[in-house]
Amino acid sequence: MSYTLDSLGNPSSAYRRVTETRSSFSRVSGSPSSGFRSQSWSRGSPSTVSSSYKRSALAPRLTYSSAMLSSAESSLDFSQSSSLLDGGSGPGGDYKLSRSNEKEQIQGLNDRFAGYIEKVHYLEQQNKEIEAEIQALRQKQASHAQLGDAYDQEIRELRATLELVNHEKAQVQLDSDHLEEDIHRLKERFEEEARLRDDTEAAIRALRKDIEEASLVKVELDKKVQSLQDEVAFLRSNHEEEVADLLAQIQASHITVERKDYLKTDISSALKEIRSQLECHSDQNMAQAEEWFKCRYAKLTEAAQENKEAIRSAKEEIAEYRRQLQSKSIELESVRGTKESLERQLSDIEERHNHDLSSYQDTIQQLENELRGTKWEMARHLREYQDLLNVKMALDIEIAAYRKLLEGEETRFASTFAGSIGPLYTHRQPSITISSKFVEEIIEETKVEDEKSEM
């Protein structure tokens, strides 16, 4: 379908009117050629995004098919063809004046429709840019979900490591308790050995006292034996002297008897008798003294032997106790060293565990803060998207109003000249395809994705 020269007029004047209409539309609607395109949808800071959003608040998400433009052009052709038919059939100057007025109105509507088409083209371009931005946001949300899964995996690994460290700590604590029990048992044995040592030392002191007493008794007995031996020697020497004196006297008396022959025979026999009696008495005293001394010496020797046996056994017991005490002391020192080593290991493990736990908590807190910031950013984008949808709905209402106005003009012209002209063509309603997605659905999908990431 084409325009006639009568309806379109001069091409230069038509182009001038379209240009003026576009410039006036740019001044009225925010200059789509300059105002809209001068602002860019940036991914900067929240202040930059909000400012750019305020400047480009008229850029909603719209998807229109090319059928709408073809339908609009067909409706324009229909209006102009109706005006041509109207101008050719009506007689009179009033009708020409009304036709010129209607022609001017149609030209104004045509100019407005041209500006509207340009605005639609611009909105389609902005719609593509916004769709690309939404796709980028969805990819970012998917990357955040994957990052959340990675964080969850790392948190699970950290929790498993923490459980392993707690298990090792419990095992070390159990070993420490066992060592404490062993140390307590060794302390009890050490105290018992110390008591036995004290008892043994007390017995040794008592035996030493007995030994000292026995030594004193032995010294006294030795002194008595020595005195008795001296006395025996003195008595023996005295007896020998007396015997010698008596023998000398006997010899002297024997000589005298020899001289006197038979006068002194009785004296020699008496002396012999006296000598025999003295020797018998001396032998008896010597035998009794030796027997008493031997008995006493045997008793003292037996007592000393018994004391020596007791002392030797006591010394052996003391040496055995000393060896046991030394071995227990060495064992106690080794156990103390093991305890100190385990305590140091336990303190190191606790310190490392506390450090790892604090680092894990810091990491978890950092991840939670990042997740919270991501959710806030997503909520901010959803709010911006809601505002864009609101602007889009307002523009849809305005577009519907323009369409109703154009359809009303077409209907009025069609009803005016339906009887005279007849139907020239079948009018098709413009097809408009609007792809939109409600914010509630996006919020619901975001909640589902958050629940999946939390699980």
Curated annotation (Swiss-Prot):
Keyword entries, A-Z: Acetylation, Cell projection, Coiled coil, Cytoplasm, Cytoskeleton, Glycoprotein, Intermediate filament, Methylation, Phosphoprotein
Region described as Coil 1B: spans on this chain: 151-249
Pfam family membership, one: Filament
GO cellular component term of the entry, any: axon
Annotated spans, Disordered: 1-52, 80-102
Keyword Cytoplasm: yes
The protein, known as: Neurofilament medium polypeptide
